[in-house]
Swiss-Prot record:
<dbReference type="InterPro" id="IPR038657">
    <property type="entry name" value="Ribosomal_bL19_sf"/>
</dbReference>
<dbReference type="InterPro" id="IPR001857">
    <property type="entry name" value="Ribosomal_bL19"/>
</dbReference>
<dbReference type="InterPro" id="IPR008991">
    <property type="entry name" value="Translation_prot_SH3-like_sf"/>
</dbReference>
<dbReference type="GO" id="GO:0003735">
    <property type="term" value="F:structural constituent of ribosome"/>
</dbReference>
<keyword id="KW-0687">Ribonucleoprotein</keyword>
<dbReference type="GO" id="GO:0006412">
    <property type="term" value="P:translation"/>
</dbReference>
<keyword id="KW-0689">Ribosomal protein</keyword>
<dbReference type="InterPro" id="IPR018257">
    <property type="entry name" value="Ribosomal_bL19_CS"/>
</dbReference>
<protein>
    <recommendedName>
        <fullName>Large ribosomal subunit protein bL19</fullName>
    </recommendedName>
</protein>
<dbReference type="Pfam" id="PF01245">
    <property type="entry name" value="Ribosomal_L19"/>
</dbReference>
<comment type="similarity">
    <text>Belongs to the bacterial ribosomal protein bL19 family.</text>
</comment>
<comment type="function">
    <text>This protein is located at the 30S-50S ribosomal subunit interface and may play a role in the structure and function of the aminoacyl-tRNA binding site.</text>
</comment>
<dbReference type="GO" id="GO:0022625">
    <property type="term" value="C:cytosolic large ribosomal subunit"/>
</dbReference>
C-alpha cells in the first residue's frame, strides 16, 4: 500500500527544476489565473520564509511588505498553476524559518544579500 502511494506522488512531481532556492532568498513566482474565460499570469515577489513538507505536497511561504502592510502567501511547489519561479536575490540567513519577519517593516524586514556560490537544499 505504501509503495502505491509513493508511486502516485512521484507521478505528480514536476519534472522541471523549480527548487533552486533556499529560505531567505527573494523570488518571483508566476501563477496562472483564470478570470472569466481569460487566462492570465500573475506574479508575486517576496522573501521565502519557510519550506515545508516534501514530495508533491511541498509548500513555500513568501513574505512581502506592500504599502506598509505585511503580506504572506503560500504556494504548493508542484502545483500545475505555477508557471515559473525566478530567483531575484540570494539571502544570507542562519535560520530554517523566518517567522520573525512577520511583524517587521522597513529596514528591519530586510535580509542580507549573499554573494557567492551556493547549492540549494534538496
Amino acid at each position: 500500500m505504501g509503495n502505491l502511494i509513493k508511486e502516485l506522488q512521484e507521478e505528480q512531481l514536476r519534472k522541471e527544476i523549480l527548487t533552486d532556492f533556499c529560505v531567505g532568498d527573494t523570488i518571483r513566482v508566476a501563477t496562472k489565473i483564470v478570470d472569466g474565460g481569460k487566462e492570465r499570469t500573475q506574479t508575486f515577489q517576496g522573501t521565502v520564509m519557510a519550506r515545508k513538507g516534501g514530495g508533491a505536497g511541498e509548500v513555500i511561504s513568501l513574505h512581502r511588505v506592500a504599502y506598509g502592510e505585511g503580506m504572506e502567501k503560500s504556494f504548493l511547489l508542484h502545483s500545475p498553476k505555477i508557471v515559473g519561479i525566478e530567483v531575484v536575490k540570494r539571502g544570507k540567513v542562519s535560520r530554517a524559518r523566518l517567522y520573525y519577519l512577520k511583524g517587521k517593516t522597513g529596514k528591519a524586514a530586510k535580509v542580507k544579500e549573499y554573494i557567492g556560490p551556493r547549492s540549494a537544499k534538496k
